[in-house]
From Swiss-Prot:
HAMAP family: Nuclease_YqgF. It is an enzyme of class 3 (hydrolase). The keyword Metal-binding does not apply. GO terms for biological process: rRNA 5'-end processing. This is Putative pre-16S rRNA nuclease. The lineage of its organism: Bacteria, Bacillati, Cyanobacteriota, Cyanophyceae, Synechococcales. Keywords: Cytoplasm, Hydrolase, Nuclease, Ribosome biogenesis. It is found in: Cytoplasm. Its main location: cytoplasm.
């Protein structure tokens, strides 16, 4: 199946880690990708209020979630966690979304932007930027999750 890039959609990208969630977004023409401050991940999902606020303020129309697959494209334990979080966001936001293989996005961010051993969350948001740039280059359409079936 051939995918085409969505038209006039501003997208939020999430790099979901165990401690923080990196955020980045693009304009509706996919010309610029900007980072947002990373969020501390809370057990009660309190960070969701901030995500929802960014979506409203920036008029974002969909989101992508990075899945850290292994080097053979298989799901890792962290990928399962990211998938669950993405599905939770979909159920709360009701926005189109897609998963993106983010294998090595942190490594690429460290090398490309020269940020190493970062505890502030900057590397997480830079990784979200890399994931979004990758998604824009690959050109997939956002999909809506209906029940357990992705269409």
């Amino acid at each position: 199946m051939k995918y085409s890039k969505p038209k006039s959609k501003s997208i939020l990208s999430l790099d979901i880690g165990t401690k923080r969630i990196g955020l980045a977004y693009c304009d509706s023409l996919f010309i610029t990708v900007n980072i947002l401050p990373a969020l501390r991940r809370e057990k009660n999902k309190n960070e969701f209020k901030t995500i929802k606020s960014h979506i409203k303020k920036l008029n974002l129309t969909g989101f992508i979630v990075g899945l850290p697959l292994d080097d053979k494209g298989r799901m890792t334990s962290q990928a399962f966690d990211c998938k669950t979080y993405g599905e939770y966001l979909f159920n709360e936001l009701k926005l189109p979304f897609s998963f993106v293989n983010e294998h090595s996005s942190t490594w690429e961010s460290e090398n490309r932007f020269g940020v190493k051993k970062d505890k502030s969350g900057l590397i997480d948001s830079l990784s979200a930027k890399v994931i979004l740039e990758q998604w824009i280059q690959e050109g997939p359409e956002l999909k809506e999750l209906m029940g357990n079936k992705q269409i």
